[in-house]
Amino acid sequence: MENIAPALLDWFYANRRILPFREDPTPYHVWLSEIMLQQTRVSAALPYYERFLAALPDIPALAGCEEEKLHKLWEGLGYYSRVRNLQKAAKIVCAQYGGQLPADYNALLALPGIGEYTAGAIASISFGLPVPAVDGNVLRVFARLYNDPRLVTDPQVKREFTARVMEHQPPAKAGDYNQALMELGALVCLPNGAPLCEQCPLGTLCRARAAGTALSLPQKTPPKARRITPVTVALVLNEGRVLLQQRPAKGLLAGLWQPVLWEDTTLTAAETAARLAALELDCTGAHFTPLPAAKHIFTHIEWHQSGYFLTVPEQPTPAGCVWAGKEQLEAAYTLPGAFKVYKKLLLTKLL
């Protein structure tokens, strides 16, 4: 196949989105943006990116940030393991590389939370190294470009696609080339049966377009069914404060704060009262008002939430819990997006 780089780069320079991490592509900026964009759209991530950098402008600041502040800066993005790995890597970078990311692909790859794609993006965009950065967008572009019906999730197929990517990469413009492929996949060679083939700079070279198969590519393994998990939530209030409990240090939503809840069960009001009593919480005379049903989807789990709102008298704080007022809920304690329906309700109830 004819080399795609000239047409691709011409298109990219004329059509690329103006993004802050492109205008100032320092290694830290590119790293942070790529971690944020792993599970988040660009438009949604930009406010978080700017807020995060304003609070933590460099890697040493990230390494030294308190965990609760770090979680608060990430609140709303979800997948909190991303930001925990970000800080773990920052601490290693400070200890081993003087607070600056190393200009070496393999050294980047060894850091927590940095996989082949992210290492390639940092190495090529920030350091100009001629290495690949192959994400889902790039796999989709090449599956269609070569009209390749194989599963792009197969490791061997991905290696072959990566080799094809490198065949076309101009070493002196590796970063721009990698970004151009990502941008083409994000703006033109769209997923879910909606490619804008008439706008594609590679349209005359695209074998899937010529064969009429672009809509069926790339082939992917069907996703596994998510496990449905019932969850009972108790919004326990006292004097303008809500009772929060901290999740375990490992596992789903590790270390984050949540309303009092019980997983894998749907409880009646009486059963909820008994569970609260087991936490040594006095609910005598409390009225249990049903909460609206809510649903939250994780990667492999789907929470179906229900529960109750109640007000209790002043009393000792149960072990592993805190009482949080509205100001603390907004500024200090990170409530994951799984509880956004109930957080919105709480903010109307708290003084």
For each of these PLM feature ranges, what is it?
Residues M1-I18, E23, A186-L351:
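Intrinsically disordered, low-complexity, charged terminal extensions of DNA damage-control enzymes
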Residues A5-A7, W11-E198, L202-A211, L215, ...:
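Catalytic cores of DNA base-excision repair glycosylases
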